[in-house]
UniProtKB/Swiss-Prot annotation:
<comment type="similarity">
    <text>Belongs to the PsbJ family.</text>
</comment>
<protein>
    <recommendedName>
        <fullName>Photosystem II reaction center protein J</fullName>
    </recommendedName>
</protein>
<keyword id="KW-0812">Transmembrane</keyword>
<keyword id="KW-0604">Photosystem II</keyword>
<keyword id="KW-0674">Reaction center</keyword>
<comment type="subunit">
    <text>PSII is composed of 1 copy each of membrane proteins PsbA, PsbB, PsbC, PsbD, PsbE, PsbF, PsbH, PsbI, PsbJ, PsbK, PsbL, PsbM, PsbT, PsbX, PsbY, PsbZ, Psb30/Ycf12, at least 3 peripheral proteins of the oxygen-evolving complex and a large number of cofactors. It forms dimeric complexes.</text>
</comment>
<feature type="transmembrane region" description="Helical">
    <location>
        <begin position="7"/>
        <end position="27"/>
    </location>
</feature>
<dbReference type="GO" id="GO:0009539">
    <property type="term" value="C:photosystem II reaction center"/>
</dbReference>
<keyword id="KW-0793">Thylakoid</keyword>
<dbReference type="InterPro" id="IPR002682">
    <property type="entry name" value="PSII_PsbJ"/>
</dbReference>
<keyword id="KW-0472">Membrane</keyword>
<dbReference type="Pfam" id="PF01788">
    <property type="entry name" value="PsbJ"/>
</dbReference>
<keyword id="KW-0934">Plastid</keyword>
<comment type="function">
    <text>One of the components of the core complex of photosystem II (PSII). PSII is a light-driven water:plastoquinone oxidoreductase that uses light energy to abstract electrons from H(2)O, generating O(2) and a proton gradient subsequently used for ATP formation. It consists of a core antenna complex that captures photons, and an electron transfer chain that converts photonic excitation into a charge separation.</text>
</comment>
<dbReference type="GO" id="GO:0015979">
    <property type="term" value="P:photosynthesis"/>
</dbReference>
<keyword id="KW-1133">Transmembrane helix</keyword>
<keyword id="KW-0150">Chloroplast</keyword>
């Protein structure tokens, strides 16, 4: 990983939050659409 001292913590938190919400959303959407079983 790069030097985290140059990256604001709020930026890291925002990116991680978006990724987590996106993964959860895709997971539930896939399960709702019947594609979750293939994952």
């Amino acid at each position: 990983m790069a030097d985290f001292t140059r990256i604001p913590l709020w930026l890291i938190g925002t990116i991680v939050g978006i990724l987590v919400i996106g993964l959860i959303g895709i997971y539930f959407y896939g399960s709702y659409s019947g594609l979750g079983s293939s994952l």
